[in-house]
């Protein structure tokens, strides 16, 4: 089996790798859109530059401002806009931190579209929803997609792109899988060829459960990332994780909707660089 670059880096790092979030401004056609694409892309590039200059290990672009979300497939203007945003991210990486990792998530659950964008823009991974098992989200019922998504990756010859999947994901109801533990779900994600899993709290900015992380990490040689609620105060508590995905804590006032705060990013990275897994 191919071990993708990002997977190798996560498993072999002496500390959790840090991935900063770029919450792309609301895109054309969505209710909150106010900016032209030129302004959206300028903001994406500016935030990417801030992240890479502060030494984060990777950056993820996500269309989080496109509320309310809709089920896949994503519409053409969303996919093309996210491709342009991803291109800005990759160009920033190449200019400031060539060794850094880049990823994408397209909401909601537009995993095939995210994979296509990652492939065409030269990114390293996608964050997927609904990879194994089903759940109920704000936008409705989300089906598991592992079989189709991995066949699509094979058809693109995009085996270099990793797929990290949320399990028991935030902003969702999981009563339909209440008899499946998060440990079992992680095992099934690995069995179905995910490259790693993401553990979150109940909502954006909410801390994950330490006990759930411990249970998931019993799956050997399988990256576990914490996908919400990480900050300078609790990073040490989750130090055994392979990666941190940080959005809210890197923003002014710790609010995900706000602009990036370079000082908060710098302070966090200095702290994380003292940690040892």
From Swiss-Prot:
Cell compartment(s), UniProt: Mitochondrion
CC terms in the record's Gene Ontology section: mitochondrion
Similarity comment: Belongs to the BtpA family.
Species assigned in the record: Caenorhabditis elegans
Matches recorded under NCBIfam families: thylakoid_BtpA
Classification via Pfam families: BtpA
Matches recorded under SUPFAM superfamilies: Ribulose-phoshate binding barrel (SSF51366)
InterPro entries with a match to the protein in the record: BtpA (IPR005137), RibuloseP-bd_barrel (IPR011060)
Protein name: Uncharacterized protein F13E9.13, mitochondrial
Keyword Metal-binding appears in the UniProt entry: no
Primary subcellular site in the record, as a coarse category: mitochondrion
UniProt keyword list: Mitochondrion, Transit peptide
